[in-house]
């Protein structure tokens, strides 16, 4: 039983890899768009409640089941940038991520989970990187974007990731000492990367 936190450069294959790892392990997979929607609902439902530290697990599960695959790209294409400066949202996001970690058997993608869960036992922190050409090629191949659209989306995603993490977390997200494993998908196939993560889960016995 484990929680896997995947941080990645957009286009390095994090969502595809995270889904595959979760499927093989029988874990739930929760990406940025889902985490933001859970946090927004928590903030809306309990905006001033100091006594509500965590969502009930059943409620989290119900909300997760209502979120579809479109929520992932919506995070990069349609999200209101003002969300990134709201400390209330970060507080709710922090609580949601910690509650999901308590539920165990979860793969989390992004939103600072590598920082939020740094001292949480049983959490494996993975970083995916790739060069820009490989990331653009992946977006074209995986989502059918034109080269221009893929390049524009990559630039926007990198800017959002950098701004969010610099606002709320004190360390560089690509600092390798934060992670149990760093995988470069320029050189590694996603299938090989998945195998390495599964082997790490098994060897660490978490």
Regions found by a protein language model. Name each.
Residues 1-4, 8, 104:
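Pre-Walker A (Motif I) flank of P-loop NTPase domains
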Residues 5-19:
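Glycine-rich phosphate-binding P-loop
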Residues 28-40:
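Short beta-strand-centered segment that lines the nucleotide-binding/catalytic pocket of NTP-utilizing
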Residues 39-105:
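ATP-dependent small-molecule kinase phosphotransfer cores
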Residues 57-67, 72, 146-190:
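Small-molecule kinase domains that catalyze NTP-dependent phosphoryl transfer to phosphate-bearing small molecules
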Residues 100, 112-119, 138:
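RNA pseudouridine synthases
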Residues 111, 127-132, 145-146, 156, ...:
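Long, contiguous binding/interaction regions
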Residues 119-142, 147-157:
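Conserved phosphate-donor/acceptor-positioning beta-strand/loop module used by diverse small-molecule
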């Amino acid at each position: 039983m484990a929680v896997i936190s995947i941080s990645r450069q957009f286009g390095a294959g994090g969502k595809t890899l995270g889904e595959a790892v979760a499927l093989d392990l029988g874990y739930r997979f929760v990406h940025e768009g889902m985490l933001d929607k859970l946090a927004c609902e928590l903030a809306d439902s309990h905006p001033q409640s100091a006594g509500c530290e965590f969502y009930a697990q059943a409620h989290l599960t119900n909300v997760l089941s209502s979120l579809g695959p479109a929520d992932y790209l919506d995070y990069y294409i349609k999200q209101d940038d003002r969300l990134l400066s709201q400390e209330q949202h970060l507080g709710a996001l922090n609580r949601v991520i910690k509650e999901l970690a308590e539920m165990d058997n979860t793969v989390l993608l992004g939103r600072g989970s590598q920082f939020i869960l740094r001292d949480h036992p049983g959490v494996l922190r993975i970083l995916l990187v790739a060069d820009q050409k490989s990331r653009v090629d992946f977006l074209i191949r995986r989502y059918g974007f034109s080269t221009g659209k893929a390049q524009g989306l990559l630039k926007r995603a990198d800017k959002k990731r950098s701004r969010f993490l610099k606002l709320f977390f004190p360390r560089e997200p690509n600092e390798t000492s934060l992670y149990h494993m760093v995988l470069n998908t320029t050189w590694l196939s996603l299938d090989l990367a998945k195998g390495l993560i599964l082997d790490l889960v098994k060897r660490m016995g978490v």
